[in-house]
Curated annotation (Swiss-Prot):
InterPro entries: 7TM_GPCR_serpentine_rcpt_Sre (IPR004151). GO terms for biological process: sensory perception of chemical stimulus. It comes from Caenorhabditis elegans. The lineage of its organism: Eukaryota, Metazoa, Ecdysozoa, Nematoda, Chromadorea. It is a multi-pass membrane protein. It is found in: Membrane. Keywords: Membrane, Transmembrane, Transmembrane helix. The chain crosses the membrane at residues 1-21, 39-59, 67-87, 127-147, 169-191, 195-217, 258-278, 291-311. One of its GO terms (cellular component) is membrane. Belongs to the nematode receptor-like protein sre family. This is Serpentine receptor class epsilon-45. Pfam families: Sre (PF03125). The gene is sre-45.
Length: 369
């Protein structure tokens, strides 16, 4: 949706990744039930995000860099949640956007007469802040595959010692690079500095590059794994390399399934967006708009179960089992401490006995002499 900010003499445009505003039907029955459903699914998404972070922290299945990248990806959902909270009142017409009191429906236009006019960004700061946060969140989701592909390429290159080292420099390079890139792209998209075709090309090329890196690294890892299994390259046959290759295999399986789930969400969003754009079923716009927004804001409902189900160590994990594991770990630690104390006491007793024995034989030797 394109907004014209300013007046006839001084103005600029702002682009929003939304399609409908002030659709008051969303607050009336039966479409109000959809808002209740979205509210419930938001809590479900919150549960899955917390669970994914908890599992990734407590069950070490991947290198620390990849684990932290996954956690950052999950935490960024709260950015999308905040943007949805800021935009939703205007989207449903609960709060009017200035003098507009009718449904606003638009996707992209270069015609100034069709743009939604707003005098200033400061007039509705919450609304426009939510739009920028939403752009940043969408771009963060899009560039995650590229960042993970680069991280796995380093894991494949430093095969023999990647797991032994923290690689903090690589981690900060990836995080800072992704964050700065998303901020710049979000600024350009929000202020409509990049044409729609240019922005779409950037997003598409980013994913094509990521898929190319992912496919190449997966192929190289498969060759290394075959060489290790066949003992054809003795220099590669070491435990760290074997361990890293297997970790890469698990990671590729996980990313492949997540990509399929992500493509399902993207295609669903594009399909319903096309329906709304062509106005094929205008009476179902609240339902279609909810599906479109859910594909963006409620993606953990699909992504997280797919992610957890693709890793054997994560598949059957529950919070209750995690609490039990933590309790068992504490009990085991106490047993080890008690054993260490008892061993220390036994050692002290044995030292005292040895000293007494040595003193006894020294006295016996002196008396014998």
């Amino acid at each position: 949706m394109i907004f014209l900010i300013g007046n006839s003499t001084s103005n600029y445009t702002v682009c929003f990744p939304i399609f409908i505003l002030e659709d008051t039907r969303a607050l009336k029955f039966p479409y109000s039930m959809l808002q209740a459903l979205e509210f419930v699914l938001t809590f479900v998404s919150f549960y899955y995000v917390i669970k994914c972070c908890y599992v990734a922290i407590h069950i070490k299945s991947f290198h620390r860099n990849l684990t932290v990248l996954l956690i950052i990806l999950m935490i960024q959902w709260f950015e999308g949640l905040l943007s949805n909270i800021l935009i939703k009142p205007y989207e449903t017409g609960f709060w009017p956007l200035g003098e507009h009191n009718t449904q606003l429906k638009q996707w992209w236009t270069k015609d100034y007469s069709k743009m939604i006019q707003v005098p200033n960004l400061s007039t509705f700061p919450n609304f426009f802040l939510g739009g920028f946060l939403k752009w940043h969140y969408i771009l963060s989701m899009i560039t995650t595959l590229l960042v993970m592909s680069i991280e796995r390429s380093f894991a494949c290159y430093f095969l023999t010692d990647y797991e032994k080292k923290s690689r903090n420099g690589l981690f900060f390079m990836l995080v800072v690079g992704q964050t700065s890139t998303n901020l710049v792209m979000g600024y350009l998209f929000f202020f409509n500095a990049a044409h729609f075709a240019v922005g779409f090309s950037i997003i598409l090329s980013t994913n094509i590059i990521a898929m190319g890196i992912f496919t190449y690294v997966k192929h190289v890892n498969r060759q290394v794994n075959r060489a290790i299994e066949d003992f054809s390259n003795p220099s590669l046959y070491c435990l760290p390399a074997r361990f890293q290759v297997r970790e890469n295999v698990r990671c590729f399986q996980m990313i492949t399934k997540v990509i399929h789930a992500g493509l399902f969400l993207i295609l669903t969003a594009c399909f319903v967006n096309l329906f709304m754009y062509l106005e094929l079923t205008p009476g179902l716009d609240p339902l279609l708009n909810l599906i479109f927004e859910s594909a963006i804001n409620l993606n953990p409902v699909v992504i997280v179960p797919t992610l957890l189900g693709s890793v054997n160590a994560w598949r059957n994990f529950t919070f209750s089992s995690g609490v039990c594991l933590g309790f068992k770990a504490q009990v085991r630690l106490k047993i080890i401490k008690v054993s260490s104390v008892s061993i220390g006491n036994d050692g002290a007793k044995s030292d005292r006995t040895r000293k007494e024995t040595d003193a006894y034989f020294d006295q016996l030797n002196s008396a014998w002499i």
